[in-house]
């Protein structure tokens, strides 16, 4: 089973003027200057910090991950002063495992930069490149055997179908971490099971 705990409240935001204020997520520092349709809004690096207690988990059987669903545009994530990961791209989910770094109380720091750079596309657009953490941040607790979380932030499941009159061929590819088999079920609109498949890990 997977448990999810949101980290949306009790953040400290240090903006371009160096002043630190309390904020909740989602948050952007361009909420005002990015509204007039011009290209004169402020772009640069700001910092978000929060503290959280370690979740209840079994380190022998489970892992803990941080999940960011949207940080625009580049991010550097630190946990307890140690760099955890970096990410370029403001519109995609990214995750990092933190099991071995957790303390009883933890400080999470996210350095966010929406400056113009050559790593994040699009380079130009007719909309504002809002800087900030504008989607959910979560703690995930999963079993060590789980659908992969670290594959470019995707779901770890790819479904393709070949529809024919009166039938459908459905192929499900699942990226997994750990050992064991994967069971896939197909339900109809009423929640009744109409198909089931099982496969072993191949690599």
Give the predicted meaning of each segment.
Residues 20-23, 147, 157-159:
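Short clusters of hydrophobic/aromatic residues that line enzyme substrate/ligand-binding pockets
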Residues 2-40:
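N-terminal structural segment of carbohydrate-active enzymes
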Residues 193-203:
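Intrinsically disordered, low-complexity Pro/Gly/Ser/Thr-rich segments with frequent PxxP/GP/PP motifs
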Residues 172-173, 185:
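Beta-strand-rich structural segments
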Residues 3-6, 11-16, 43-150, 154, ...:
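Accessory beta-strand-rich segments of carbohydrate-active enzymes
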Residues 23, 86-87, 196-197:
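Short capping micro-motif at the N-terminus of alpha-helices
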Residues 62-64, 166-172:
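Structural beta-strand segments of beta-rich domains
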């Amino acid at each position: 089973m997977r448990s999810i705990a949101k980290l949306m409240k009790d953040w400290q935001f240090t903006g371009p003027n160096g002043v630190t204020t309390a904020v909740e997520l989602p948050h952007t520092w361009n909420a005002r200057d990015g509204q007039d349709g011009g290209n004169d809004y402020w772009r640069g690096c700001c910092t978000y910090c929060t503290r959280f207690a370690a979740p209840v988990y079994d380190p022998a059987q489970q892992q803990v991950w941080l999940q960011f669903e949207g940080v625009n545009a580049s991010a550097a994530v630190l946990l307890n002063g140690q760099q955890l990961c970096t990410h370029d791209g403001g519109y995609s989910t990214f995750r990092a495992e933190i099991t071995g770094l957790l303390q009883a109380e933890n400080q999470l720091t996210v350095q966010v930069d929406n400056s113009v750079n050559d790593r994040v596309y699009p380079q130009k657009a007719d909309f504002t490149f809002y800087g900030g953490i504008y989607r959910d941040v979560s703690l995930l607790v999963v079993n060590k055997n789980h659908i992969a979380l670290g594959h470019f932030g995707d779901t770890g499941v790819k479904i393709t179908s070949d529809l024919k009159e009166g039938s459908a061929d459905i192929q499900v590819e699942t990226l997994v971490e750990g050992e064991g088999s994967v069971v896939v079920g197909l339900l109809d609109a009423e929640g009744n099971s109409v198909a089931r498949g099982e496969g072993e890990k191949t690599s």
